[in-house]
Amino acid sequence: VAHTLELYSRYTFDYPYPVAISVNAPVGGMEYPMICWQRPRPEKDGTYSKRTKYGLISVIIHEVGHNWFPMIVNSDERQWMWMDEGLNSFLQFLTEQEWEADYPSRIMPERMGGLLNYLKSPNKMPIMTGADSLQSTGYNAYTKPTLALNILRESVLGREQFDYAFKQYARRWMFKSPTPTDFFRTMEDASGQDLDWFWRGWFYGTEHTDISIENVHHYKMDTRDPYKDKIAKKDKRNAEPDRLFQKLNKPLPKRVDAFPELKDFYNEYDELDITDKDRASYEKLIKGLSDKEKAMLKRKGQFYVVDLKNLGGLVMPVVLKVTYEDKSTEEIRLPAQIWRRHPESISKMIVADKKITRIEVDPHRETADVDIENNYFPRRMREHTFGISKSKKPSGNNPLRDKQKAEEKARKEAEEKKKKEAEKEKNKKPAPKKK
Protein backbone atom coordinates (compact mmCIF):
# COMPACT_ATOMS: atom_id res chain seq x y z
CA VAL A 1 0.00 0.00 0.00
CA ALA A 2 2.80 2.40 0.92
CA HIS A 3 4.59 1.62 -2.35
CA THR A 4 1.42 2.43 -4.32
CA LEU A 5 0.89 5.74 -2.53
CA GLU A 6 4.51 6.73 -3.16
CA LEU A 7 4.58 5.84 -6.88
CA TYR A 8 1.12 7.13 -7.82
CA SER A 9 1.89 10.42 -6.03
CA ARG A 10 5.10 10.73 -8.01
CA TYR A 11 3.36 10.26 -11.36
CA THR A 12 0.26 12.37 -10.60
CA PHE A 13 -0.31 14.34 -7.37
CA ASP A 14 0.11 13.74 -3.65
CA TYR A 15 -2.46 11.45 -2.02
CA PRO A 16 -4.92 13.88 -0.36
CA TYR A 17 -6.65 11.56 2.13
CA PRO A 18 -5.58 10.68 5.72
CA VAL A 19 -5.67 6.86 5.34
CA ALA A 20 -5.60 4.11 2.72
CA ILE A 21 -6.89 0.71 3.86
CA SER A 22 -6.45 -2.59 2.02
CA VAL A 23 -8.36 -5.63 3.31
CA ASN A 24 -7.22 -9.11 2.23
CA ALA A 25 -10.70 -10.65 2.13
CA PRO A 26 -11.98 -13.79 0.34
CA VAL A 27 -13.77 -11.65 -2.24
CA GLY A 28 -12.92 -10.15 -5.62
CA GLY A 29 -11.19 -6.79 -5.85
CA MET A 30 -13.42 -3.80 -5.18
CA GLU A 31 -12.49 -0.22 -4.46
CA TYR A 32 -14.04 2.63 -2.50
CA PRO A 33 -12.51 5.94 -1.37
CA MET A 34 -9.75 5.17 1.18
CA ILE A 35 -10.66 1.45 1.48
CA CYS A 36 -10.61 -1.60 -0.79
CA TRP A 37 -10.97 -5.39 -0.64
CA GLN A 38 -9.09 -7.98 -2.64
CA ARG A 39 -7.98 -11.59 -2.87
CA PRO A 40 -6.26 -14.10 -3.20
CA ARG A 41 -5.39 -15.31 0.28
CA PRO A 42 -2.64 -17.72 1.39
CA GLU A 43 -3.46 -21.37 2.10
CA LYS A 44 -4.55 -22.40 5.59
CA ASP A 45 -1.05 -23.72 6.29
CA GLY A 46 0.43 -20.30 5.53
CA THR A 47 1.97 -21.25 2.18
CA TYR A 48 1.13 -19.70 -1.16
CA SER A 49 1.96 -20.12 -4.84
CA LYS A 50 3.94 -17.71 -6.99
CA ARG A 51 0.72 -16.81 -8.77
CA THR A 52 -0.93 -15.99 -5.44
CA LYS A 53 2.00 -13.83 -4.35
CA TYR A 54 2.18 -11.65 -7.45
CA GLY A 55 -1.57 -11.71 -7.98
CA LEU A 56 -2.11 -10.24 -4.53
CA ILE A 57 0.61 -7.59 -4.90
CA SER A 58 -0.85 -6.52 -8.25
CA VAL A 59 -4.44 -6.34 -7.09
CA ILE A 60 -3.49 -4.34 -3.97
CA ILE A 61 -1.68 -1.82 -6.19
CA HIS A 62 -4.63 -1.74 -8.57
CA GLU A 63 -7.39 -1.30 -5.99
CA VAL A 64 -5.49 1.26 -3.91
CA GLY A 65 -4.67 3.05 -7.17
CA HIS A 66 -8.36 3.55 -7.85
CA ASN A 67 -8.23 6.33 -5.25
CA TRP A 68 -6.68 8.39 -8.06
CA PHE A 69 -8.73 7.02 -10.98
CA PRO A 70 -11.74 7.46 -10.82
CA MET A 71 -12.16 8.67 -7.22
CA ILE A 72 -10.24 11.94 -7.63
CA VAL A 73 -9.82 12.26 -11.40
CA ASN A 74 -13.52 11.54 -11.64
CA SER A 75 -14.17 10.22 -15.15
CA ASP A 76 -17.45 8.48 -16.00
CA GLU A 77 -16.51 4.80 -15.60
CA ARG A 78 -20.01 3.69 -16.60
CA GLN A 79 -19.49 5.25 -20.02
CA TRP A 80 -15.72 5.09 -20.60
CA MET A 81 -14.41 2.19 -18.55
CA TRP A 82 -10.87 2.56 -19.94
CA MET A 83 -10.53 6.04 -18.43
CA ASP A 84 -10.37 4.60 -14.92
CA GLU A 85 -9.45 0.93 -15.41
CA GLY A 86 -7.03 1.58 -18.27
CA LEU A 87 -5.22 4.59 -16.79
CA ASN A 88 -5.12 2.87 -13.41
CA SER A 89 -3.78 -0.37 -14.94
CA PHE A 90 -1.09 1.65 -16.70
CA LEU A 91 0.08 3.25 -13.44
CA GLN A 92 -0.19 -0.19 -11.83
CA PHE A 93 2.30 -1.46 -14.42
CA LEU A 94 4.75 1.37 -13.67
CA THR A 95 4.39 0.70 -9.94
CA GLU A 96 4.93 -3.06 -10.36
CA GLN A 97 8.11 -2.49 -12.34
CA GLU A 98 9.57 -0.55 -9.39
CA TRP A 99 8.62 -3.28 -6.91
CA GLU A 100 11.31 -5.66 -8.15
CA ALA A 101 13.28 -6.42 -11.31
CA ASP A 102 11.40 -8.39 -14.00
CA TYR A 103 8.08 -8.21 -12.17
CA PRO A 104 5.60 -10.47 -14.09
CA SER A 105 3.21 -7.72 -15.20
CA ARG A 106 0.39 -8.39 -17.64
CA ILE A 107 2.08 -6.69 -20.59
CA MET A 108 5.45 -8.38 -20.17
CA PRO A 109 6.32 -10.14 -23.49
CA GLU A 110 6.02 -13.64 -22.03
CA ARG A 111 2.46 -12.90 -20.82
CA MET A 112 1.11 -11.06 -23.87
CA GLY A 113 0.06 -14.07 -25.94
CA GLY A 114 -3.65 -13.72 -25.21
CA LEU A 115 -3.65 -9.96 -25.83
CA LEU A 116 -1.79 -10.27 -29.14
CA ASN A 117 -4.24 -12.94 -30.29
CA TYR A 118 -7.10 -10.60 -29.40
CA LEU A 119 -5.52 -7.67 -31.24
CA LYS A 120 -5.40 -9.64 -34.50
CA SER A 121 -8.76 -11.39 -34.06
CA PRO A 122 -11.80 -10.42 -36.18
CA ASN A 123 -13.93 -9.87 -33.05
CA LYS A 124 -11.92 -7.02 -31.52
CA MET A 125 -13.56 -3.72 -30.64
CA PRO A 126 -12.16 -0.17 -30.33
CA ILE A 127 -11.10 1.05 -26.90
CA MET A 128 -13.55 3.92 -27.45
CA THR A 129 -16.53 1.56 -27.23
CA GLY A 130 -19.16 2.37 -24.61
CA ALA A 131 -18.73 0.29 -21.44
CA ASP A 132 -22.13 -1.40 -21.77
CA SER A 133 -21.29 -2.60 -25.29
CA LEU A 134 -17.88 -4.13 -24.51
CA GLN A 135 -17.53 -7.86 -25.06
CA SER A 136 -13.89 -8.27 -23.97
CA THR A 137 -13.68 -5.95 -20.99
CA GLY A 138 -10.34 -7.28 -19.76
CA TYR A 139 -8.56 -6.57 -23.02
CA ASN A 140 -10.42 -3.42 -24.10
CA ALA A 141 -10.63 -1.56 -20.80
CA TYR A 142 -7.54 -2.82 -18.96
CA THR A 143 -4.74 -4.40 -20.98
CA LYS A 144 -4.91 -2.68 -24.37
CA PRO A 145 -4.99 0.86 -22.90
CA THR A 146 -2.06 -0.10 -20.65
CA LEU A 147 -0.11 -1.35 -23.66
CA ALA A 148 -0.99 1.71 -25.75
CA LEU A 149 0.07 4.20 -23.08
CA ASN A 150 3.30 2.34 -22.42
CA ILE A 151 4.14 2.48 -26.15
CA LEU A 152 3.29 6.20 -26.18
CA ARG A 153 5.63 6.67 -23.21
CA GLU A 154 8.55 4.53 -24.36
CA SER A 155 8.51 4.65 -28.17
CA VAL A 156 6.69 7.84 -29.21
CA LEU A 157 7.11 10.67 -26.70
CA GLY A 158 9.86 9.39 -24.44
CA ARG A 159 9.59 9.03 -20.67
CA GLU A 160 10.37 12.61 -19.67
CA GLN A 161 7.88 14.21 -22.06
CA PHE A 162 5.15 11.64 -21.40
CA ASP A 163 5.49 11.74 -17.61
CA TYR A 164 5.21 15.53 -17.61
CA ALA A 165 2.10 15.46 -19.83
CA PHE A 166 0.42 12.69 -17.81
CA LYS A 167 1.07 14.53 -14.54
CA GLN A 168 -0.44 17.68 -16.06
CA TYR A 169 -3.58 15.73 -17.02
CA ALA A 170 -3.96 14.33 -13.51
CA ARG A 171 -3.43 17.71 -11.83
CA ARG A 172 -5.64 19.70 -14.20
CA TRP A 173 -8.53 17.29 -13.82
CA MET A 174 -8.33 16.24 -10.15
CA PHE A 175 -11.75 16.62 -8.48
CA LYS A 176 -13.26 17.22 -11.94
CA SER A 177 -14.95 14.97 -14.51
CA PRO A 178 -12.84 14.67 -17.68
CA THR A 179 -13.96 13.01 -20.91
CA PRO A 180 -11.72 11.11 -23.37
CA THR A 181 -11.20 14.23 -25.47
CA ASP A 182 -10.02 16.09 -22.36
CA PHE A 183 -7.38 13.42 -21.85
CA PHE A 184 -6.31 13.47 -25.52
CA ARG A 185 -6.14 17.27 -25.69
CA THR A 186 -4.25 17.61 -22.42
CA MET A 187 -1.64 15.04 -23.45
CA GLU A 188 -1.10 16.87 -26.76
CA ASP A 189 -1.07 20.33 -25.18
CA ALA A 190 1.36 19.39 -22.40
CA SER A 191 3.69 17.37 -24.64
CA GLY A 192 3.58 19.81 -27.54
CA GLN A 193 3.04 16.92 -29.97
CA ASP A 194 0.29 16.21 -32.50
CA LEU A 195 -0.90 12.73 -31.50
CA ASP A 196 -4.06 12.49 -33.62
CA TRP A 197 -2.60 9.54 -35.53
CA PHE A 198 -1.94 7.70 -32.27
CA TRP A 199 -5.40 8.20 -30.73
CA ARG A 200 -7.05 7.33 -34.06
CA GLY A 201 -5.14 4.07 -34.41
CA TRP A 202 -5.04 2.80 -30.83
CA PHE A 203 -8.28 4.14 -29.36
CA TYR A 204 -10.73 4.62 -32.24
CA GLY A 205 -9.54 1.89 -34.61
CA THR A 206 -9.11 -1.88 -34.48
CA GLU A 207 -5.95 -2.24 -36.55
CA HIS A 208 -2.92 -3.95 -35.03
CA THR A 209 0.85 -3.78 -35.41
CA ASP A 210 2.35 -6.16 -37.95
CA ILE A 211 5.27 -4.66 -39.86
CA SER A 212 6.98 -7.05 -42.25
CA ILE A 213 10.33 -6.82 -44.02
CA GLU A 214 9.27 -7.78 -47.53
CA ASN A 215 12.66 -7.47 -49.21
CA VAL A 216 16.13 -5.98 -48.95
CA HIS A 217 17.93 -4.74 -52.07
CA HIS A 218 21.71 -4.36 -52.13
CA TYR A 219 23.10 -1.68 -54.46
CA LYS A 220 26.64 -0.77 -55.40
CA MET A 221 27.81 2.39 -57.14
CA ASP A 222 28.25 1.93 -60.90
CA THR A 223 31.48 3.89 -61.24
CA ARG A 224 31.57 3.43 -65.04
CA ASP A 225 35.25 2.58 -64.54
CA PRO A 226 35.85 -0.47 -66.75
CA TYR A 227 38.75 -1.59 -64.58
CA LYS A 228 36.36 -1.92 -61.64
CA ASP A 229 32.91 -2.57 -63.01
CA LYS A 230 33.72 -5.03 -65.79
CA ILE A 231 36.11 -7.02 -63.63
CA ALA A 232 33.52 -7.20 -60.85
CA LYS A 233 30.83 -8.35 -63.30
CA LYS A 234 33.15 -10.99 -64.72
CA ASP A 235 33.96 -12.30 -61.24
CA LYS A 236 30.26 -12.50 -60.44
CA ARG A 237 29.53 -14.35 -63.70
CA ASN A 238 32.36 -16.81 -63.15
CA ALA A 239 31.13 -17.53 -59.63
CA GLU A 240 27.73 -18.65 -60.91
CA PRO A 241 27.30 -22.47 -60.82
CA ASP A 242 26.71 -24.39 -64.04
CA ARG A 243 23.13 -25.32 -64.82
CA LEU A 244 22.40 -29.04 -64.72
CA PHE A 245 22.14 -29.30 -68.50
CA GLN A 246 25.48 -27.50 -68.88
CA LYS A 247 27.13 -29.93 -66.50
CA LEU A 248 25.67 -32.94 -68.32
CA ASN A 249 26.52 -31.53 -71.77
CA LYS A 250 30.19 -30.84 -71.06
CA PRO A 251 31.50 -34.27 -72.11
CA LEU A 252 29.48 -34.25 -75.35
CA PRO A 253 31.55 -33.66 -78.52
CA LYS A 254 31.05 -30.22 -80.08
CA ARG A 255 30.94 -29.68 -83.84
CA VAL A 256 33.10 -26.55 -83.79
CA ASP A 257 35.84 -28.58 -82.10
CA ALA A 258 35.70 -31.13 -84.92
CA PHE A 259 35.61 -28.40 -87.58
CA PRO A 260 37.59 -25.38 -86.28
CA GLU A 261 36.89 -23.47 -89.49
CA LEU A 262 33.35 -22.93 -88.15
CA LYS A 263 34.67 -20.66 -85.40
CA ASP A 264 34.66 -16.90 -85.88
CA PHE A 265 35.34 -13.71 -83.92
CA TYR A 266 32.47 -14.23 -81.48
CA ASN A 267 33.69 -17.61 -80.30
CA GLU A 268 36.52 -15.85 -78.45
CA TYR A 269 34.79 -12.52 -77.83
CA ASP A 270 33.90 -11.59 -74.23
CA GLU A 271 31.75 -8.49 -73.79
CA LEU A 272 33.27 -8.02 -70.33
CA ASP A 273 36.81 -7.69 -71.64
CA ILE A 274 38.19 -4.15 -71.32
CA THR A 275 38.63 -2.42 -74.68
CA ASP A 276 40.23 0.81 -75.88
CA LYS A 277 36.74 2.13 -76.50
CA ASP A 278 35.86 1.52 -72.83
CA ARG A 279 38.96 3.41 -71.68
CA ALA A 280 38.27 6.38 -73.95
CA SER A 281 34.62 6.52 -72.92
CA TYR A 282 35.55 6.55 -69.23
CA GLU A 283 38.14 9.30 -69.68
CA LYS A 284 35.58 11.42 -71.50
CA LEU A 285 33.03 10.85 -68.74
CA ILE A 286 35.44 11.91 -65.99
CA LYS A 287 36.39 15.13 -67.79
CA GLY A 288 32.73 16.16 -67.95
CA LEU A 289 31.99 15.65 -64.23
CA SER A 290 32.04 18.26 -61.47
CA ASP A 291 34.20 17.77 -58.39
CA LYS A 292 31.11 16.76 -56.38
CA GLU A 293 30.12 14.14 -58.95
CA LYS A 294 33.67 12.79 -59.04
CA ALA A 295 33.62 12.45 -55.25
CA MET A 296 30.35 10.51 -55.45
CA LEU A 297 31.87 8.06 -57.92
CA LYS A 298 34.82 7.50 -55.62
CA ARG A 299 32.68 6.94 -52.54
CA LYS A 300 33.16 3.53 -51.00
CA GLY A 301 30.16 2.01 -49.30
CA GLN A 302 27.18 -0.28 -49.40
CA PHE A 303 23.71 0.91 -50.34
CA TYR A 304 20.64 -1.00 -49.16
CA VAL A 305 16.92 -0.39 -49.65
CA VAL A 306 14.62 -2.08 -47.12
CA ASP A 307 11.01 -2.64 -48.24
CA LEU A 308 8.58 -2.56 -45.30
CA LYS A 309 4.89 -3.47 -45.42
CA ASN A 310 2.26 -2.47 -42.86
CA LEU A 311 0.27 -5.72 -42.80
CA GLY A 312 -1.63 -4.89 -39.59
CA GLY A 313 -2.70 -1.41 -40.67
CA LEU A 314 -1.70 0.36 -37.44
CA VAL A 315 0.76 3.21 -38.02
CA MET A 316 3.70 2.90 -35.63
CA PRO A 317 7.34 4.00 -35.32
CA VAL A 318 9.79 1.61 -36.98
CA VAL A 319 12.83 0.34 -35.10
CA LEU A 320 15.47 -1.47 -37.16
CA LYS A 321 18.39 -3.44 -35.74
CA VAL A 322 21.11 -3.80 -38.39
CA THR A 323 23.82 -6.46 -38.01
CA TYR A 324 27.00 -6.15 -40.08
CA GLU A 325 29.42 -8.81 -41.31
CA ASP A 326 31.85 -8.02 -38.47
CA LYS A 327 29.04 -8.82 -35.93
CA SER A 328 28.66 -5.15 -34.93
CA THR A 329 25.11 -3.75 -34.73
CA GLU A 330 23.35 -0.44 -35.22
CA GLU A 331 19.85 0.67 -34.25
CA ILE A 332 17.87 2.93 -36.58
CA ARG A 333 14.66 4.53 -35.25
CA LEU A 334 12.14 5.95 -37.71
CA PRO A 335 9.19 8.06 -36.46
CA ALA A 336 5.61 7.10 -37.28
CA GLN A 337 5.45 10.03 -39.69
CA ILE A 338 7.44 7.94 -42.18
CA TRP A 339 4.11 6.29 -43.14
CA ARG A 340 2.39 9.65 -43.78
CA ARG A 341 2.35 9.51 -47.59
CA HIS A 342 2.23 5.74 -48.00
CA PRO A 343 0.57 4.09 -44.97
CA GLU A 344 0.63 0.60 -46.52
CA SER A 345 4.27 0.24 -47.58
CA ILE A 346 7.50 2.22 -47.49
CA SER A 347 11.14 1.80 -48.49
CA LYS A 348 14.07 2.99 -46.39
CA MET A 349 17.60 3.46 -47.74
CA ILE A 350 20.54 2.53 -45.51
CA VAL A 351 24.03 3.68 -46.49
CA ALA A 352 26.73 1.69 -44.70
CA ASP A 353 30.48 1.29 -44.79
CA LYS A 354 30.16 -2.46 -44.13
CA LYS A 355 28.10 -5.27 -45.56
CA ILE A 356 24.82 -6.01 -43.82
CA THR A 357 24.10 -9.62 -42.88
CA ARG A 358 20.80 -9.24 -41.02
CA ILE A 359 18.02 -6.73 -40.38
CA GLU A 360 15.35 -7.04 -37.67
CA VAL A 361 12.22 -4.96 -37.01
CA ASP A 362 11.24 -4.18 -33.40
CA PRO A 363 14.21 -5.89 -31.72
CA HIS A 364 13.08 -4.80 -28.22
CA ARG A 365 9.47 -5.98 -28.71
CA GLU A 366 8.22 -2.48 -27.93
CA THR A 367 5.45 -2.02 -30.51
CA ALA A 368 3.27 -5.11 -29.81
CA ASP A 369 3.95 -6.64 -33.23
CA VAL A 370 1.65 -9.67 -33.50
CA ASP A 371 3.91 -11.66 -35.85
CA ILE A 372 7.63 -11.41 -35.16
CA GLU A 373 8.56 -14.09 -37.70
CA ASN A 374 8.25 -11.63 -40.61
CA ASN A 375 10.41 -9.13 -38.71
CA TYR A 376 13.65 -10.75 -39.88
CA PHE A 377 15.61 -10.59 -43.10
CA PRO A 378 16.72 -13.12 -44.01
CA ARG A 379 13.94 -15.11 -42.37
CA ARG A 380 14.94 -17.20 -39.36
CA MET A 381 14.17 -20.89 -39.02
CA ARG A 382 11.23 -21.52 -36.71
CA GLU A 383 11.89 -23.82 -33.77
CA HIS A 384 9.23 -26.10 -32.29
CA THR A 385 9.20 -28.86 -29.69
CA PHE A 386 7.35 -32.13 -29.36
CA GLY A 387 7.35 -34.84 -26.74
CA ILE A 388 5.47 -37.59 -24.96
CA SER A 389 2.87 -36.70 -22.39
CA LYS A 390 0.52 -38.68 -20.19
CA SER A 391 -2.57 -37.39 -18.48
CA LYS A 392 -2.21 -36.95 -14.75
CA LYS A 393 -4.28 -35.63 -11.94
CA PRO A 394 -3.81 -31.86 -11.73
CA SER A 395 -2.20 -30.55 -8.58
CA GLY A 396 -1.91 -27.02 -7.29
CA ASN A 397 1.26 -25.16 -8.22
CA ASN A 398 2.59 -24.22 -4.78
CA PRO A 399 6.41 -24.47 -4.74
CA LEU A 400 6.57 -22.99 -1.23
CA ARG A 401 4.42 -25.81 0.14
CA ASP A 402 6.43 -28.37 -1.84
CA LYS A 403 9.65 -26.97 -0.35
CA GLN A 404 8.28 -27.13 3.17
CA LYS A 405 7.05 -30.71 2.64
CA ALA A 406 10.46 -31.73 1.28
CA GLU A 407 12.20 -30.14 4.27
CA GLU A 408 9.79 -31.86 6.67
CA LYS A 409 10.37 -35.21 4.95
CA ALA A 410 14.15 -34.75 5.11
CA ARG A 411 13.92 -33.82 8.81
CA LYS A 412 11.87 -36.93 9.64
CA GLU A 413 14.23 -39.16 7.65
CA ALA A 414 17.21 -37.70 9.52
CA GLU A 415 15.49 -38.28 12.88
CA GLU A 416 14.58 -41.84 11.90
CA LYS A 417 18.15 -42.53 10.84
CA LYS A 418 19.51 -41.10 14.08
CA LYS A 419 17.04 -43.18 16.08
CA LYS A 420 18.04 -46.39 14.29
CA GLU A 421 21.72 -45.69 14.84
CA ALA A 422 21.06 -45.16 18.55
CA GLU A 423 19.13 -48.45 18.75
CA LYS A 424 21.91 -50.24 16.93
CA GLU A 425 24.50 -48.84 19.32
CA LYS A 426 22.39 -49.81 22.31
CA ASN A 427 21.94 -53.40 21.14
CA LYS A 428 25.61 -54.01 20.50
CA LYS A 429 26.98 -56.93 22.62
CA PRO A 430 29.89 -55.91 24.85
CA ALA A 431 33.24 -57.40 23.82
CA PRO A 432 34.41 -60.36 26.04
CA LYS A 433 36.85 -59.37 28.74
CA LYS A 434 40.41 -60.64 28.39
CA LYS A 435 41.63 -63.04 31.07
Model regions: which residues?
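Beta/coil-rich, acidic/histidine-enriched accessory regions frequently appended to metallopeptidases
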Residues: 171-418, 426-428, 432-435
